[in-house]
Amino acid sequence: MQFVASEHPHRRLNPLNGQWVLVCPHRTQRPWSGQQEKAQKNELPEFDPTNPLCPGVTRPNGIQTPEYESTYVFENDFPALVEVVPVPPNNDDPLFQIAPARGNCRVMCFHPKSNLTLPTMSAAEIVVVIDEWISQFNELSAKYAWVQIFENKGAAMGCSNPHPHCQIWSCSFLPTEPQLKQERLRAYYATNERPMLADYVERELQRQERIVIENRDWLVVVPFWATWPFETMLISRNNNKRINDLTAEQRYNLALTIKELTTKYDNLFQCSFPYSMGWHGAPTGPEHAHASSAHWTLHAIYYPPLLRSASVRKFMVGFELLAMAQRDLTPEQAAQRLREVDGKCHYLEK
């Protein structure tokens, strides 16, 4: 019997964190009778007087959101991290380690209208979002070791407010995922004298089978090691290390790429496609200001939960929680489906 990746179970290594993913393509034929999600409704009003992220509405803490006309950033009313916090006492017990955690949490509204999302915004409006990301990054990266820009879109990914927005959490420490990448990227660079993701981009361009979108500045792929069904990685092709390295032209092409990718997502199942996404780049702050970042390549990751339709999602439970990550649809099959979906015209505009 000859191995066929699209038919037989196998494991794939994620070189960014050293963890393996179990791929079981034969399971795509199994019947499904599990939980189905309610698709997010698209009939949202432009303005909701009860939504605290809308212009002019008073938030639960009594602060009125200003009448903003573009992006709007404010300090999170219920932050996970705060800047002033007592330092924990020293503890030498290896089983009860504790460390300080300082930081800042902000909310950033993409647009004053509640019924828009990134795929239904114009490229020019998305450029404004990117510019604000960079402005916030410039300010916060001077002080903090890690600035995590991320968006949770849709109730299926825990988003409690449908208004188009993201969050920016800044940490005095390097969080777990970036720390793993820092170590793996640095080790690869020490051995190969090349950034891992620069080599990865070259290899994917040669193979073509996992590419979703390709242009001069950006590459979108379903990673070889993807865990989520339609997971994608948006990678800089210009040796950018951090988001504030981007030129005006690269920002505009990024806006076009984000719009095309998220339009493909929405068109795949003709719904407002939920996901969690975020940016990863070289660490920042005084601790990392003078350290080499040659091993890093700026990239974003999209983790969408939907599997078979707008109402069927993947759950990370059982074996995934207790043993290792597992997927059914192969990354190559997912990439082909995303490639074939229209990314230029949103289904609501047809």
From Swiss-Prot:
Pfam families per UniProt: GalP_UDP_tr_C, GalP_UDP_transf
Name of this chain's protein: Probable galactose-1-phosphate uridylyltransferase
A GO BP entry: UDP-D-galactose metabolic process
Pathway(s) served: Carbohydrate metabolism; galactose metabolism
Protein EC: 2.7.7.12
Alphabetized CDD domains for the sequence: GalT
Annotated source species: Drosophila melanogaster (Fruit fly)
Binding-site residues, UDP-alpha-D-glucose: 76-77, 152, 167, 314-317, 319-320
Cofactor(s) in the UniProt record: Zn(2+)
Catalytic activity: alpha-D-galactose 1-phosphate + UDP-alpha-D-glucose = alpha-D-glucose 1-phosphate + UDP-alpha-D-galactose
InterPro entries named in the record: GalP_UDPtransf1, GalP_UDPtransf1_His-AS, GalP_Utransf_C, GalP_Utransf_N, HIT-like_sf
Family: Belongs to the galactose-1-phosphate uridylyltransferase type 1 family.
Entry GO CC: cytoplasm; cytosol
The keyword Metal-binding appears for this protein: yes
